[in-house]
Amino acid sequence: MTLSRRFLILGTICLLYGTATAQSMLADAPKCAIDCLTELLSQKEYAEMGQEAMCSSEPFAKATGVCLMVKCSMRQTMDFIKESSAACGIPPTNNTTSYRVNSTVVFAFALVFFALRIVTKFRLGLTWGIDDTLTTLSVAVMIPYYIVLQIMLALGLGLDMWFISDSQIILIFKLFIVIEVLYLTALVLVKAAILCFFLRIFPDHKFRIVVKCTMVFNALIWVGFFVFVFFQIQPFSLFWNGWQQKKGHLILTGFTNFTLPLAGINLLLDIWMLILPVTQLWGMGLKLKKKLGVISMFSVGIFLTIVAAIRVRELVAFLLSQDLTGRHFQSIIQITS
């Protein structure tokens, strides 16, 4: 590196970190990051920038990011982001504790309502149906889901990606596959339980055919997910180490092409399942007030529809984010609901 280039970089780091630490920061900064700063600061539009302008300039941030992705490894890039964020006074994301509390509260509520269902079933001597079995299975699946989620939080889920070690990131991505499989399995079981409940209480022949077709469609969603997960990305290890090889775009493209449509289909299926009982309840020989009351009881599932809509929004935000571990929890916390 020429003396003039070294002074140029030293001046930049003085702006970012202060003169007292400039020499040490220069020694610690990756050569690729220094090269990027040199390249950018030689351009007219960035040459006269001060610290505040550098920290607040979106074009400068984007240009730096593009250069780092080309010239640096992912770890070098993340280390530089961590240092520059501290220099610019950008606080690190750390919502792990609040997320752990939120997920625990939601999971506890789910267990309480399930326990109330079981107690009521036995105290009143009600018949145990297939829908009860499927509901029990869904809760059984959600227990390991919750445990895996807590492990992911302990590893750094909810923190900025650049504050987590490579081994932690890899393990989080591996557990991400596990948690998605558990989530979709629980979701399919819950919907199957609701559809079986419809079959138990509504005798109309045509309606029952429609419900059974809906059950088949619900099962196909589950099968389609597994086909995607295990056959879309080859080699399969790209799911957890593709980010190191700068092949993460292949994974995100796959998720964009499949996960978003899947979330949209699930949302439409939720809406369809809200409409199904209404078609039967509306024809009952009840007064309007009682009819609306019964319909409102069956419409409690609108909560799941709202959750599905939030999931679509959060998946879009997750796929567009560069901070995969920091953003990932917003796309996952509502799953526990």
Task: Write out the residue ranges for each language-model feature.
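Fungal secretory targeting signals
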Residues: 1-26
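Residue-level recognition of alpha-helical structural elements
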Residues: 25, 76-77, 206-209
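Eukaryotic multi-pass alpha-helical transmembrane domains
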Residues: 29, 34-70, 94-155, 170-337
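Extended, hydrophilic extramembrane loops/domains of integral membrane proteins
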Residues: 66, 71-85
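Short, aromatic-rich amphipathic segments at membrane interfaces
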Residues: 84-97
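Juxtamembrane helix-capping/reentrant segments at transmembrane boundaries
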Residues: 159-172
